[in-house]
Design a protein with these regions (language model features):
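Well-ordered, non-membrane alpha-helical segments in soluble/globular domains
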Residues: 121-131, 241-253, 284-294, 367-370
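Short loop/helix-cap segments at secondary-structure boundaries that form the rim of catalytic
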Residues: 153-157, 269-277, 310-314
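Secretory-pathway glycan-assembly enzymes, especially type II membrane glycosyltransferases
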Residues: 3-13, 17-221
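Short loop/turn segments at strand-loop or loop-helix junctions that form parts
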Residues: 106-112, 196, 224-235, 264-266
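Catalytic donor nucleotide-activated moiety binding site of glycosyltransferases and closely related
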Residues: 146-149, 228-287
């Protein structure tokens, strides 16, 4: 039970930042992304909003002085700023698009899957799967607050939970929604004991993905498709036009490998010949299933980020373009699967490093890496299955050829950065 926070006055143990006197809990606030205690100090006569300790691995809690209208303790700016502007960020618009409540037992666990980053939402969802069909928690009902973009993943167990689905863009989950607060409070009053699941992330290993609606194929005997995850907001190069040129060159080279080439993601004005273009301008309810099935058993290629999380889970091999600023969040944006040993992880995940704009990544290098996987597929497959194979030197040479090209900053990098900014300004 150490992953669960019980909502009662006995478990509340926050102290005043000024006098260290124990605070009095007034009420809970379930505003969406962040859950808050509203409390006061009898001695100082101060009123506060304090983060509930349901997040692990982030700089909580922020302590907001309601009288001063500011966060009065030392926390990271990205965590502090939304709370300091809470009066401007409280939203009364109803974003609840679906509600299904099934009250059976006397105990409830609330799972908050909302976040402004897709990868964070997904990690919380994977944590939820631990509780589904777990005998240890058979005496509990589960209330899941989920963004509409992830609902398709819970088809396999949606009938076992109560559900609040919300519909808005991920970026807007930085706001505080009164409709969510009101609905959760209406539900929890029907229970004797209520708990919030305490998130444990950054998490670097996903072990219960079989319960989710994802077509995972870790290994295949032969690669017959390559999937490019195409984004307008995460691009290779300085502009969308330069990204188009990059992928056009890469696709021309990939055609020589006799594999099907698919594009998924954002549709823009640029078109590609001789590919299966599954990009869309607007997400519809079925497109995620189509994309995931397309990625299943493939080589996926794209710019590093949580947008690559599910494609990398479904695929047999994953190639991501990374600038050095993104190294810190590998654990949050990469799915290290259950039972993958070190050798298997090296096989599955490949990273190609570039500058800030990824403009110095050569399509020829990417092609060489893809070819090393496709052409030597049988060697690789035998290696990860721990069977005997003879061409170990060839495999090592192929790894070296596709080795990560980590760049160091120099005088030439500064010049290149200036050139990139000029190109971005004039859109070439």
């Amino acid at each position: 039970m150490n992953n669960l926070l019980k909502l009662d006055t006995y478990s509340f143990d926050e102290k005043c930042v000024y006098c260290r006197n124990k605070l009095v809990l007034e009420k809970y606030c379930f505003y969406g992304w962040r859950y808050l205690y509203e409390c006061r100090c009898k001695k100082c006569n101060k009123n506060f909003l304090i983060d509930m300790p349901i997040f692990s691995g982030i700089p909580y809690p922020a302590v907001y002085d309601k009288d001063k209208k500011k966060v009065v303790n030392d926390v990271a700016d990205w965590w502090k700023d939304p709370l300091e502007n809470i009066n401007l960020r409280i939203v009364h618009e109803n974003i609840i698009s679906y509600l299904n409540i099934n009250i059976v037992r006397k105990k409830l666990i609330v799972f908050n899957l909302l976040d402004f980053v897709f990868g964070h939402c997904f990690m919380r969802l994977e944590g939820l799967t631990y509780y589904i069909d777990n005998e240890e928690y058979k005496e509990y009902d589960f209330l899941v607050v989920i963004p509409s973009q992830l609902r398709f993943l819970i088809k396999n167990f949606e009938n076992k939970i109560s559900l609040i689905e919300t519909s808005t863009s991920f970026s807007k989950y930085r706001y505080f929604y009164t409709c969510i607060d009101r609905e959760i409070k209406n539900i929890i009053q029907n229970y004797c004991d209520v708990y919030c699941e305490m998130l444990k992330y950054p998490q670097q290993e996903f072990v219960r993905l079989a319960k989710l609606n994802i077509p995972i194929r870790k290994w295949v005997n032969e690669i017959d498709k390559i999937v490019i995850v195409y984004r307008k907001d995460r691009i290779v190069g300085v502009t969308n036009k330069s990204q188009y040129i990059f992928y056009k060159k890469l696709i021309l080279m990939l055609k020589s490998l006799n594999t099907k080439i698919f594009l998924i993601g954002d549709k823009d004005k640029y078109r590609f010949a001789n590919v299966y273009d599954l990009r869309v301008e607007k997400i519809d309810p079925d497109i995620d299933d189509i994309w995931n099935e397309t990625c299943s058993g493939s080589i996926t290629i794209g710019v590093h980020g949580s947008n690559m999380l599910i494609p990398s889970i479904c695929s047999s091999y994953n190639i991501e373009f990374v600038n050095t600023d993104k190294l810190y969040n590998f654990g949050q944006a990469t799915a290290f699967l259950e039972n993958l040993n070190q050798q298997e992880t090296i096989q599955k995940y490949r990273y190609i490093y570039g500058n800030e704009y990824l403009s110095n990544i050569d399509p020829k290098m990417v092609y060489a890496l893809v070819k090393s996987i496709v052409v030597k597929m049988n060697y690789v497959f035998n290696a990860v299955r721990h069977e005997k194979f003879d061409d170990i030197d060839t495999i090592r040479k192929l790894y070296q050829m596709a080795n990560n090209c980590k760049l160091t900053y120099s005088f030439y990098d500064k010049i290149n950065s200036i050139i990139c900014k000029i190109r971005k300004f004039i859109n070439i």
